[in-house]
């Protein structure tokens, strides 16, 4: 947002502005929507039956072929799913959880009156998914899938224009839990570099990254790796799977967290580098967000509305400084 982009914080229980049925229609979009609706309609075993897949396909095709663009949504789609009153567990009942017309608990996720996310208009965009990324939480997988699909559409547009698209996936191991987002991530790694797309995958916990189901593919497809200090690290069954040598590891674990030094490894070459950002307090409030600073930004936006960065950023800096000073005085 500070560089002229758009920043969205998706909040649990609040309308996301996501409506996949109002994306531009194409065979690619339809295939994605079939799969997305199937994810929302999974039974207790985590799947839909072949007959249910057919119902989903017919319902999606009916919606996209016969309903005006502005009226396409999850609730209208549900009208094409036949009720099965003799079955306690049925597709219509499962999909009702995602529909406003049924008072569905998760209707805020994908059943919005309009789609606020047009990949043709994206330039720089960021999403805060802190509220959405939860274990055993039904909205996590479909919301992630939708955002990854938007990114895929954006990549197609940027590639056609001869541009470059950079993607940063924080805590990448979390979306890699799900098959649909695994597929998107592998596509990014394997094919998007040919379309001038590149990706940064980050994780605060090496163990979470290493336990990722597609970690071996990620290691093979990422030529450059950066390792931050981790004095408590282990080599065997941990860092040895990342491709660094024992010698590199031995030097890495000697580093303290305060050293500001890290290991860069590319192919068979490696080097240690230092990045000291002392004195960059104002900039760090933007480069590395915190819940406190995000709350400050939210308050400013509520007060000032959607104004240019030149107007809100000076106010943001002042309030962050005030909050920092108040914290220091309290600790003194």
Predicted regions and their residues:
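P-loop NTPase motor domains
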Residues: 1-197, 210, 253-257, 262, ...
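C-terminal regions of RecA-like/P-loop NTPase motor modules
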Residues: 209-332
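Aromatic-lined carbohydrate-recognition surfaces of secreted/lumenal glycan-active proteins
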Residues: 206
């Amino acid at each position: 947002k500070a560089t002229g982009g758009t920043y969205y914080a998706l909040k649990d229980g609040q309308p996301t502005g996501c409506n996949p049925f109002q994306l531009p229609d194409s065979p690619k979009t339809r295939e994605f929507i079939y799969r997305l609706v199937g994810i929302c309609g999974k039974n207790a075993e985590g799947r839909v039956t072949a007959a249910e897949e057919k119902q989903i396909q017919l319902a999606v095709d009916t919606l996209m072929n016969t309903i005006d663009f502005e009226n396409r949504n999850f609730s209208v789609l549900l009208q094409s799913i036949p009720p099965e009153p003799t079955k306690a567990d049925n597709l219509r009942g499962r999909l009702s959880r995602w529909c406003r017309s049924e008072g569905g608990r998760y209707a805020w996720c994908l059943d919005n009156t309009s789609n606020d996310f047009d990949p043709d208009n994206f330039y720089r965009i960021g999403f805060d998914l802190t509220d959405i990324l939860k274990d055993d939480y039904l909205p996590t997988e479909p919301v992630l899938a939708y955002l990854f699909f938007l990114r895929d559409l954006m990549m197609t547009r940027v590639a056609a224009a001869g541009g470059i698209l950079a993607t940063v996936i924080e805590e990448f191991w979390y979306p890699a839990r799900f098959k649909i987002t695994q597929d998107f991530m592998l596509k990014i790694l394997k094919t998007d570099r040919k379309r001038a797309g590149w990706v940064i995958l980050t994780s605060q916990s090496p163990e979470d990254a290493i336990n990722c189901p597609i970690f071996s593919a990620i290691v093979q497809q990422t030529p450059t790796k950066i390792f931050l200090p981790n004095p408590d690290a282990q080599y065997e069954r941990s860092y040895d799977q990342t491709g660094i040598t024992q010698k590199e590891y031995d030097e890495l674990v000697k580093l303290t967290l305060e050293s500001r030094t890290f290991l860069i490894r590319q192919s068979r070459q490696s080097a240690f580098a230092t990045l000291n950002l002392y004195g960059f307090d104002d900039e760090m409030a933007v480069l590395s967000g915190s819940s406190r600073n995000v709350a400050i930004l939210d308050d400013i936006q509520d007060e000032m509305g959607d104004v240019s960065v030149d107007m809100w950023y000076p106010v943001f800096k002042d309030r962050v400084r005030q909050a920092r000073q108040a914290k220091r005085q309290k600790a003194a």
